[in-house]
Amino acid sequence: MEKETKEKIEKTVIEILSESDMKEITEFKVRKLASEKLAIDLSEKSHKAFVRSVVEKFLDEERAREYENSQVNKEEEDGDKDCGKGNKEFDDDGDLIICRLSDKRRVTIQEFKGKSLVSIREYYKKDGKELPTSKGISLTDEQWSTFKKNMPAIENAVKKMESRV
């Protein structure tokens, strides 16, 4: 499939999805409407796969937007929590502290072997210094993006788990 054709299909599919009721529209309906608008048969296997990828990308972006909006609303409701403060705070190693989750846990951005990592870790005090423990996780940019993209699914799973208890 030519680049120009792909761009036309992608633009049309996104336009259709943007104007549609997401509770009613299906991938088949999107493909059918795009076929009619573009006068191209999109029932071919490669076209179906491409339309599916555009739909999935659109839905992922929508979920991410909804999640971000819900987080912004939560932050506004929560008021003065440590996360999201305008003041930048750094630890003893010079790592940026994004958020203190509790007295012993925090989220930081740190450099390790030339890579930036998002670190969610537990800390302990020794000789007046706060030092990281091995309890925690450090994520690369790519891993963080994947984690963030899947946050709505993780939240839903946690809600289901909590409702069973």
Curated annotation (Swiss-Prot):
InterPro entries: DEK_C, KELP, PC4_C, ssDNA-bd_transcriptional_reg, Sub1/Tcp4-like. It comes from Arabidopsis thaliana (Mouse-ear cress). It is found in: Nucleus. GO terms for biological process: positive regulation of transcription initiation by RNA polymerase II. Residues 66-93 are annotated as: Disordered. Belongs to the transcriptional coactivator PC4 family. Keywords: Activator, DNA-binding, Nucleus, Transcription, Transcription regulation. Residues 3-60 form the DEK-C domain. The keyword Nucleus applies. This is RNA polymerase II transcriptional coactivator KELP. The gene is KELP. One of its GO terms (molecular function) is transcription coactivator activity. The lineage of its organism: Eukaryota, Viridiplantae, Streptophyta, Embryophyta, Tracheophyta. Pfam families: DEK_C (PF08766), PC4 (PF02229). General coactivator that functions cooperatively with TAFs and mediates functional interactions between upstream activators and the general transcriptional machinery. Binds single-stranded DNA. GO terms for cellular component: nucleus.
